[in-house]
Amino acid sequence: MSTEGSAVDTLTIEEAAAELERLAKEIAHHDALYHGKDQPEISDADYDALKRRNDALEARFPELIREDSPSRHVGAAPSVTFSPVVHARPMLSLDNTFSQEDVQDFVAGVYRFLGRLPDQSIAFTAEPKIDGLSMSIRYENGRLVTAATRGDGTTGENVTANIRTIAEIPNELPKGVPAVVEIRGEVYMAKSDFLALNRQMEAEGKQTYVNPRNTAAGSLRQLDAKVTASRKLKFFAYAWGEMAEMPADTQFGMVQTFKDWGFPVNPLMKRLNSVADILAHYDEIGLERPDLDYDIDGVVYKVDSLELQQRLGFRSRSPRWATAHKFPAEQAFTEVEKIEIQVGRTGALTPVARLKPITVGGVVVTNATLHNEDYIKGIGNSGERIRPEEHDIREGDTVIVQRAGDVIPQILDVVMEKRAADARSYEFPKTCPVCGSHAVREVNEKTGKTDSVRRCTGGFICRAQATEHLKHFVSRNAFDIEGLGSKQVDFFFENEDPSLQIRTAPEIFTLEKRQQDSLTKLENIDGFGKVSVGKLYAAINERRSIALHRFIYALGIRHVGETTAKLLARSYGTYEAFATAMKEAAPLSGEAWTDLNAIEGIGEVVARAMVEFYKEPRNVEVIGRLLDEVTPAEAEQPVTAGSPVAGKTVVFTGSLEKFTRDEAKARAESLGAKVAGSVSKKTDIVVAGPGAGSKLDKARELGVQTMDEDEWLALISG
């Protein structure tokens, strides 16, 4: 059962460990999208909520802090497209504050750490938090030599050639500057330039950009510096990395020095002493925000004295002497013109509000997700009422729209005073709008709870599900067919030419053969070419033999993710054994059903979803055709005979020096061990490298066997 919405103080240690594992993976996923690809899929507010949940769990269960915890890392791994640059000093993130009370606590914490009374003797700087791309620019002997993105905080991407195209960034500094100077700041795109660029894109019939921040980041990562130069990027300097000598002894003085050296600095930066003045400046900047020609998402406060900054020091990923006071999400009023239903890969019917275009935070909003049937009625996922009963969302309603975290729009409430007298409640469809199949809300037999999502039962016969299923089938953790991405799948799916059409997975593997006898050659179609088509065929043929767990995952069975697919592959060994077991488990009773539920990590909900999938004749028919083209390899079984760690639960902690964590995990699993992320009474062995902390302490407290890497290697090699 998910503990996602449960209060932290009600969780058991096992539940907390499981949720910390989920949060680590989820936050890492969103970090990669935001910092690495500039394509966030959740709002800043939702992301901050995930981080706060993680921090709260770690505060209550410090012994469960993971090596891959979000509290220990910044940003995401740098892209392989640009050469890596190791920062001379790490580029850390800032802790966030969200209320006046949080700011008061931050200031009080500074005084408390320094052993002082809060007598307003400590000055702070306050400046807008620019919503752009963090940058570190290195000068040696006054000349610009390197510019790098934040990356993961330790290693960034070398974008020197592109940075040189930004007119506001000097290529040379005045005489007399220190021998080594690293200027840090934010690259951004002005709102006016962003709107002009989108007008140009519209005039050329091209897709417009979403917001200035993503556009600036994408522009800076262009392989052709001429493209970057055409985007009119700008820069604000506000910090520094390595400095051969310090030209000032305060934060404010350093930034003023940057201005003297020719860098643009933010004119709204102030030096203040009291919490009241700090909060007043926050309000002033908030009032000016709509009129600024650049996006900001908060105000940054820093202790002004560099000596005090040094005494205050750092936490694992952020300084104690600074915090970012975030703005609440921006809101606006608009009209719901229509409610439409989208159908996803698993058949979920998701309502989307088509809105009368409205600008919120510099971005034109035309759509908002309505999540599910209950959300339209004002009911949350746990059955709680989130709006008054009469505030259901109807077509024609005037609504309050919020860009939470300035990314994803959502409807907060209905303005009842403007509701038309003849406005009718929205009737959620009971059939799929794409294929006409029944759409049902499943009931959990154990809990009796009705799923908040209504799903199409059409499976592969539903065009919407079929398209999304194909995209899942070729995705990175499934068949991973290079050259067959989302756009290509849409092209082949919608094509009416029999030699080009791909509507089920088996047709991917017959494409080349069908093309041989066709007059319509793929290589002659816009967007393709002889070389790219050849590479596509080669990539497809490479996947005619595939690992069993990838094959199972690619089938797109509901609830069967990558980890579950690996468990199934290891348990059954061959696809034939797996498919036979699913067929024999169909009555939801008997030996096959019992064995399926006995697999660790497979609960009744997952087991039932798999059995139901194989009950559908259409699914079995498609898989049969797929097996004519593809051979799932027999799963490699752990070598447990004579293995000293077979059946044991192992935890790796600290900095491993002789192998990577993935290598250590793979080796342990190949010997029949289970690798866990946290220490508990069920743990058998803890392998501790340098820097091992709370997990090692917990192991000793519980009497769990501990060893270093050499002892571990001796154990598994003996």
Swiss-Prot record:
> Which transformation does this protein catalyse, written as a reaction?
NAD(+) + (deoxyribonucleotide)n-3'-hydroxyl + 5'-phospho-(deoxyribonucleotide)m = (deoxyribonucleotide)n+m + AMP + beta-nicotinamide D-nucleotide
Residues that coordinate or bind Zn(2+):
C432, C435, C456, C462
InterPro entries reported for this sequence: BRCT_dom, BRCT_dom_sf, DisA/LigA_HHH, DNA_ligase, DNA_ligase_AS, DNA_ligase_CS, DNAligase_adenylation, DNAligase_N
Enzyme Commission no: 6.5.1.2
Active site: which residues? K129
Protein residues bound to NAD(+): D44, A45, D46, Y47, D48, S93, L94, E127, R150, E186, K302, K326
Chain ranges of the BRCT domain = 640-718
Q: Name one GO molecular function term.
A: DNA ligase (NAD+) activity
Q: Where is the signal peptide?
A: none
Per the record, a Pfam family? Answer: BRCT
Q: Per the record, GO CC terms?
A: cytosol
Keyword set, alphabetical order: DNA damage, DNA repair, DNA replication, Ligase, Magnesium, Manganese, Metal-binding, NAD, Zinc
GO BP terms in the entry: DNA repair; DNA replication
User: Does the record bear DNA damage in its keywords?
Assistant: yes
Q: Which cofactor does it need?
A: Mg(2+); Mn(2+)
Its function? DNA ligase that catalyzes the formation of phosphodiester linkages between 5'-phosphoryl and 3'-hydroxyl groups in double-stranded DNA using NAD as a coenzyme and as the energy source for the reaction. It is essential for DNA replication and repair of damaged DNA.
* PANTHER family per record: CHROMOSOME TRANSMISSION FIDELITY FACTOR 18, DNA LIGASE
Name listed for the protein in its UniProt record: DNA ligase
Q: Taxonomically, what lineage is the organism?
A: Bacteria, Pseudomonadati, Pseudomonadota, Alphaproteobacteria, Hyphomicrobiales
